[in-house]
Amino acid sequence: SSAASDVYKRQAVGNGGIGILPWKEPFSIKQIVLNHVFDAGAPHEVSRLIRGINPFSMNVKVDGQVVDGTHISGWEQCILLKEALHQTRFVYANKLEVSYNICALRSMPYAGLVQVKVKALAPVDLSVENGAEVPDEYLQPRIQRKSIQDYGLHLKLLRTSALTRHRNLQVSATSAFIFENDTKVEESDNKRNIFTKYLKTGEDFSFALLGAVCSQRDFIDPCNESDREVIYGAKEGVDRLMDLHLEQWNELWKGDIQIVGDDEAQRAVRFALYHLYSSARSGSRLSIPPFGLTSQGYNGHIFWDTEFWMFPPMLFLNQGIARSMMDYRTDRLKPACQRAFSYGYRGAMFPWESDDVGEEPCPTFALTGPFEHHISADIAIATWNYYCMSRDIRWLREDGFPLMEQVAEFLVSRAEQNEDGSYSICNVVCADEYAEGVDDNAFTNAAARCALQDASKAAALCGIKAPVSWNAVAKGLRIPKFSDGVTREYEGYDGQIIKQADASLLAYPLKAITRPEEIKRDLLYYEPKIDKSGPAMSYSVLALQYARLGDGEKAYELFVRSFRPNQLPPFGVISEGAGGTNPYFTTGAGGLLQMVINGFCGLDLTDNGIKQLPSALPKHWKKIIVKGVGPNRRTYVREQQ
């Protein structure tokens, strides 16, 4: 929660379909984010996640004066994580107590609800006006009003539709006021819906604003569909909508983490879980971008962040969301194969950034698009891990192995054989993106080796004989080393500052390095090399390894470095790097959660299922409880020794 603050960084509510970003001004909603709905950012430029038409805009007046940031006392906002509600309270001009909640309805992925309660502290005339705000990425907005009086409904619908500026995608937003008792809604001079109410001293009054935002990505006729969603929700009633919303969030929270003895860590972990849950949903066949549904950061594209950082905690705690994240990739296997073909390779070459069609939308000024090839291996590894958790052999045969097979073929065609018989992957951008155009990046090669080995195991389970080349390349891929045994990030690396963890990923999650002394050697070497303003997840993966090595205090030191320097007021949302200003960084949330689940609690996914490895807790933690793990929703506990 937060009192009034000059520095204000957003805290969104989301349901996996839309994200709603409330703001600090009374009744203000900054923007709506639509999951996986794209337009070009500019003529002939790459795709960018679009902001939705905002149907929740309200202009509230008390005795003819607009309720804005002035004459406000007792201002407080909080995010209720369990209920996924954004709550604001204040007193206006000593005349009106106000409380309102904003939520993205979990039971309706394209709808949101604003519930308002007021109490008159003096006799007041209240007027509330609702309209839609149309972002500048749209053309030709059209406003339509419709009256619904049937089956006990008395609704005044307000619909605003428009086309996106560059690709002519139609988006429609509809809203309607809902009251406990009959209240007359009229049309204002500027084609908005408005109602007025006289309140006596001590009188309570409440109303709700229901809105839906639909697009041609999901509906052939988004205009009528946004109307239908509001009509349906109004007929269900506010109480039932909220009951269903809370019921579905209660189900999500069955996958939970409890930390006994550290309230700060508990809040950070629950905040991270909340943001992943609110950015995705089971059955959507969609994935999570680096900033979830909180902004247009990184154009809303899907990166390795998904499979490497956000997918693992969802795989442990929510099978439905994990499956949707997998579906996102298997649905886009064909364009990945076409991309490999266009670059002269075999198999499937997944794009570094992915939008709805699964082609490469990375801006052309960035070399990551054509050269950061570890992404294909990362996706194949996640595919095998999904099978190891689910044990769904039918899925493996029909969806998983076909993807793994095509990635294996790409990796074999991408590798080059050296004169000594070893194999190299040359001219890549590393996970450490400060390193461009290098040969034999340790992480890229180790990930490729892991993906090839996993593909061979999957082939055997599917009754298919794996090509000999898969094993030959996997065995022969070079992993550079310094003379003292430290993993060398790439051939020619000589101690430069790195953007983020790279060689350190060989111990976890790749398990390419397993001896404790080798893991410790790499940790000690690379920790001081990490750019202190780099992405948040680097320190979490180092912390995880220290926890497994038995050093709980060092693990804790790095754990808090993965989120404390990145927290922003007033809610403590985290940015990508220390000093950043664009929250919420869901990739960092994924790293933080892996630190707790797989580090402090010691859970490890193997070919044969989940094992709990030895691990150490910080001294002030009493125990950690991870609930709802895997298909059987098991509970794991690690107590202080």
What are these regions (language model features)?
Residues 1-13, 17-23, 27-30, 34-298:
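Acidic/polar, glycine-enriched structural segments that form the non-catalytic walls/loops
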Residues 6-37, 309, 361, 417, ...:
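C-terminal capping/lid segments that line or modulate ligand- or cofactor-binding pockets
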Residues 39-48, 136-143, 295-300, 331-339, ...:
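Short, mixed-charge aromatic SLiMs
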Residues 244-264, 283-291, 340-345, 485-490, ...:
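Short coil/turn segments at secondary-structure boundaries
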Residues 251, 255-260, 264-279, 427, ...:
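Long, charged, mostly alpha-helical binding arms that flank functional sites
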Residues 271-278, 328-335, 402-414, 450, ...:
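Alpha-helical scaffold segments in carbohydrate-active enzymes
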Residues 280-294, 320-381, 387, 394-398, ...:
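Helix-terminus loop motifs that line ligand-binding clefts
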Residues 302-332, 381, 385-388, 398, ...:
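Active-site core of glycosidic bond-cleaving carbohydrate-active enzymes
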